């Protein structure tokens, strides 16, 4: 079932800017392994669900998957063949605004090889470049860019 907000204050939102890196959610917090975004992009609720299904099917219901992003921004679209003007289009779907360095998915309770392959399958469903990260590398300071 696709992720959608239960209720929202405003149906239509501005597009906004995606400058800079993520402010929070940059470390693996729940599982042992994570999938980190290397680019900023909108990720739709269907792409999130496709990545989740790919991971859980590969793991054969073993381990646990945490989804660290949620599609809370609506995007609009006008009908095909509709001319410019006459207002903003109707809401067409939901997206999560993902900035670079954000941990999008986490896995726990499986081996590193299984987690690495599951994350590779999940990354193939997403429109951005991703990186496999481990919790112990971040705790040891391996997540810095000074190396």
From Swiss-Prot:
Q: What InterPro entries does the database record attribute to this sequence?
A: Ribosomal_uL16 (IPR047873), Ribosomal_uL16_bact-type (IPR000114), Ribosomal_uL16_CS (IPR020798), Ribosomal_uL16_dom (IPR016180), Ribosomal_uL16_sf (IPR036920)
Sorted keywords for this record are:
Ribonucleoprotein, Ribosomal protein, RNA-binding, rRNA-binding, tRNA-binding
Query: Does the record bear Ribosomal protein in its keywords?
Result: yes
Q: Which domain of life does the protein's organism represent?
A: Bacteria
Role description: Binds 23S rRNA and is also seen to make contacts with the A and possibly P site tRNAs.
By its UniProt entry, which HAMAP family does this protein fall under?
Ribosomal_uL16
The name under which this protein is listed is: Large ribosomal subunit protein uL16
Which gene name does the record give?
Answer: rplP
